[in-house]
Every structure is written in structure tokens, then in C-alpha cells.
Swiss-Prot record:
Catalyzes the hydrolysis of alpha,alpha-trehalose into two molecules of D-glucose. Its cofactor is phosphate. This is Trehalase. Its EC number is 3.2.1.28. Homomultimer. Pathway: Glycan degradation; trehalose degradation; D-glucose from alpha,alpha-trehalose: step 1/1. GO terms for cellular component: plasma membrane. GO terms for biological process: trehalose catabolic process. It catalyses: alpha,alpha-trehalose + H2O = alpha-D-glucose + beta-D-glucose. GO terms for molecular function: alpha,alpha-trehalase activity; trehalase activity. InterPro entries: 6-hairpin_glycosidase_sf, 6hp_glycosidase-like_sf, GH15-like, Trehalase-like_N.
Amino acid sequence: MVLHAQPPDQSTETAREAKALAGATDGATATSADLHAPMALSSSSPLRNPFPPIADYAFLSDWETTCLISPAGSVEWLCVPRPDSPSVFGAILDRSAGHFRLGPYGVSVPSARRYLPGSLIMETTWQTHTGWLIVRDALVMGKWHDIERRSRTHRRTPMDWDAEHILLRTVRCVSGTVELMMSCEPAFDYHRLGATWEYSAEAYGEAIARANTEPDAHPTLRLTTNLRIGLEGREARARTRMKEGDDVFVALSWTKHPPPQTYDEAADKMWQTTECWRQWINIGNFPDHPWRAYLQRSALTLKGLTYSPTGALLAASTTSLPETPRGERNWDYRYAWIRDSTFALWGLYTLGLDREADDFFAFIADVSGANNNERHPLQVMYGVGGERSLVEAELHHLSGYDHARPVRIGNGAYNQRQHDIWGSILDSFYLHAKSREQVPENLWPVLKRQVEEAIKHWREPDRGIWEVRGEPQHFTSSKVMCWVALDRGAKLAERQGEKSYAQQWRAIADEIKADILEHGVDSRGVFTQRYGDEALDASLLLVVLTRFLPPDDPRVRNTVLAIADELTEDGLVLRYRVHETDDGLSGEEGTFTICSFWLVSALVEIGEVGRAKRLCERLLSFASPLLLYAEEIEPRSGRHLGNFPQAFTHLALINAVVHVIRAEEEADSSGMFQPANAPM
């Protein structure tokens, strides 16, 4: 791809943009946006529901924080300075909890929305009765800033690009005249505190918002624009009539870095952000295939969910978007889960995104004590800065998304006993060692401790991969992941020259496998959710994906087909049947999209490539208009449920799509099919 050497002259694009407005998007993403629009309306609650469908939000990131923008052009989720900080705009969880809208007055439904190709820069096209607008939104990226002194937050190796901590919005009127309005009403600390505005200079072009209580304990927001700002209580407003060729910029910043003061400066920052994203996406290896757009968008989303200073990968950008409409299954996913590590490394290494994989692995090494010679018991999850205490609390003053309560911050699962984490981290160590063809010396003590933990606890019950809040059980998938810990540990010990450990751990792995095959398989030859019960569980697809048994083992085939036929709704996979599982919660839940993508990969593994491809095509058709995924899908309506966008889902998408593509390629060649996570 040839990249511009200087910012494009937007005025030269005006005529072309005006002519192309009816189809102002490009490629599959643009078409998808247009085709999905009616579906989003029909799949939501009543048409006048003030909460947009979850799938209709756009996702932005600068690798240090994230935000969500509604179709109406309103920023409805932004937490600063970190993605797990308290929100300053939280309208997605309560319509009065803060917003920042920029768009035409009196119009709330855009003509088209798309990401600029290869980026997380949002472009929205608006038509009114009198004219057309194009709005672009980005969290700004710039050249690395900390030249004179070291960063206090970055632990990973500095890159060429760094977050500028500016939410930038630019507007161009490309035809006729349009009345533009801007409304910025922050609500600090999850709407527990209001905002106090004041002008920062003699003119109307800049204003500052602070929390009305203990302002020094909360971020200061600076609003800079070439509009005339009016301050009305907690709201900063602006309104102007734009004619063809007019430009507007609005920059919201929370940083020491200077915001743009003119439209030209804003256009330059928008261009450099585009350049940053396009340089990054060019690093990846993406197949020449019709599904390439889904792989690229998933890669961009995963990059957007990274916290660059530490290498952590957020499970999702949000908290408390409901898994059950108006239900209680609402959790805070703005943290880094250890179990995500294996799937992250599978997906990122597969696409050639080694740096992100290595940074995430370095984060895991940090929290496990490998990088500082400390002993830390491994937790299920951590804060993006490596924090170990994630105490859960409920925000009763917020209505919740579409009145799903409670809204939770923190996550009480951080101190649960979940035995799959040792297998996850050992598989991560193994994948990392394979990529480098060595076991880093500082990892061996940590590796050994995690294997010893698996040996000590594998016979005990736990809360399982799904973090159930009922009583601990002997979950079969947890035992499988304990086997993974011993199996990968033995392979790593051999690489390290520790023959005695390798022999000992391989023997214990065989013991665990024998126990699972005796107690975790029913009379049909199907793996069950827990010992002594015949309930199914989608996590048993990991039996084949982790190489616990080979794909041609009858028990593998029986399990994959049983899940495909018996644990699905309209062909999409449930985690488990809630009436068969004591998860400590009430209500139903949607199908888990990661499980459906796991099923795609598993079907390919057992040779059911045609069925896998059909399921994959169906899953891809459920993508949001911008090719994003929440945690769950309601199969009859296609509605997205749960936190958004979901890293786990996009990681499983990458693995599933690559499985299908490689199987297709293998059908046209004489070589041997290699699945995405094939062992050495």
C-alpha cells in the first residue's frame, strides 16, 4: 500500500465526496453497514427505545483508552485516562450519565457509517433536507512524545507512535447548507459527580470542565474548537450554519499535549492517526480471501483493546452491557484475563502480529512474577496496570443499558478458584517459546510453579472457565486444562534440558487424562460438563483444540457433533443449558459467539469442513454494521448482547476463519492441512 507523504488536501476531495455520498462507504464494510441498518431496527426493542442496539456503536481506541459512539454521533462511553477509569461519558448505561454529540440539528439517523480502511477512524455521512455533512472521529495517535524523560506508565518497549489523549472530531459540509450542533455534557465518576465549565481564555473557542466535587481527584477535560462555545450549566453547546466547503473541528483533551487550535492542525492530526493505523495493519499477514475484511477488522479491534503501556489485553471496552435483556448478568470486562492469553497468542501469531503477542506475554510475565523474581499466586484476571484487587461494587444510581441492572464495576471473579488458568498460561509459555525457539531463562521458575499448582489442585473442584457463582464443581474442561499445564510443561522442560521434570510431568499428565476419560465421558462417548453428570458444555470443544485427544478419536467426534446438534439454538452455540448448571444467577442468556466460532474450528478438525464453512458464513453475517461483535448473539433476532466489542469473540473468529481458509486451500493442494494452532 502506498501511503501519503503529507496530509491530503481535503478541499480537493470535496467534489468527489459529494458525488459519492449515496454510497459514501467502500468495500464490504460499507455494504454491510447499509444492509444491516434495517436489521438493527427490527431486532431491537420498540423503535423509540432511547438506547441504541449494542451492535450499532462504533469503537475507537488510542491504545490507552477507548470510546463508543452511537449512530446519532454521540460519544456515550469514554473512561479516562485508562479504559478501566470511571466514565466521563456514560449514556450507554444511563441516558443522563454524560454524552458528547456532534452532528446536524434535528437529524439522528445517518446516511452511512464506515471506518476509514485499515483504521479505527470513524466516518459518518449525514443528509439533511438542505445539505450533506461528513464527520470523522478519532482518538488521536502521534509520534512518541517522551523524548527528554522516560514515561512513568509505559513498561513495554517504546514504539514509534503514542496516544495523544485527544478525542478529535472534524466536520466538512460537502453540499448545500446544514445546521450543525454540538453538545458536550460530561458526568464524572460514573455520573456520581456533575461538571463545572469555565472558559479558558477571553474568546469562545475553548472551555474547561472539572468535577464539581474534589476536582483535583478527577480528570480535567479541555474542549477546543473553531465554533463559538456557550456554557449552559453542565453542558457546553455550539450551533452554526455550515455551507459547502466549510470546516469545523472539535477536540476534547485530557492531557499535557496541546490540542489543535485550527482546522488545518486538526486535519494534520487526523491524517497522522490514519497513517499510524495503516502502518500498523500493514505488518500483519492477511490472506487474499473474501473474509479478509473480517480478519483485519478483528485484528484492529484487538489492537484497540490493548493497553499499550503494559501490553494488557482488555476482555472488552465496557462494563455491564447485559447478557440477558433487562437481566442481572451484567459484568465489568475492562480487565485482562489470563485465559485470554492462549487465544490471544494463537490469533496474533497466526496473523503475524508478533509484537502485540510478545507485549501481552510480557504483561503475563509481569503479573506472574517472572520479570522481577517474585512469587505471586496466579489470579484469574488483573487490572490493565497489573492490579490484583478488583473489588466488585454495584452502581445503583444508574439505570443500566435498557434498564438491565445492576451496573457493576470491578469483578468479583478475580479471586475465584479457576483451575484452567494454569493450562492457559503454560500453553502461552509454550507458544511463546515456539515462536522464539527457546525458553527464556527468567520463565523457567514461573513455569515450574504453575505446573506445581496444577499438580496440587487438579483433583479439586473449581468455578470453571465460565466463572459460575454457584457451588464449585469438578468441571471436565478445568481438568483438561490441568492436563494442558502438565503436557506443555513437560515439553518445555525437555527444551530446557530438565529431563527428570519432563518425565515426571508427562506421567502426571497421563494420570489426569486417564481420570478424565474415566469420569468425564458419558455412555455415548461424549465429554460432559462435570463429573457424574451428562450435561453438555461448549468448553469441551477445547478437547480437540488443545490436542487433549486427536481429531480422529471417536470421543472427540461424538462430543463435537453432540454440541453442534444438542447445545445450539438456531445453529448457534450456548455455553451450557442454564437449567442444567448452577451458575448462581437467574434468567436465560444468548448464544456465546466465541463458542460458535470454537465449533467452526472443531468441525474443521474432525473433517466436517462444509458444515464448518456454512456455520462460519452464518456467524460472519451476524457481525455488526462495522464488523464488530459483542459477547453473545440472540439467534432469532441477531441482536448482540453483552459487553462490546469482545476480545474473546474476535480472537475465536480469527482462529475459526483461518481454520476454514486453510482447509479450503488444502482441498486444492496435495499437502497436509495444518490447523491454526497446530503443535510443532
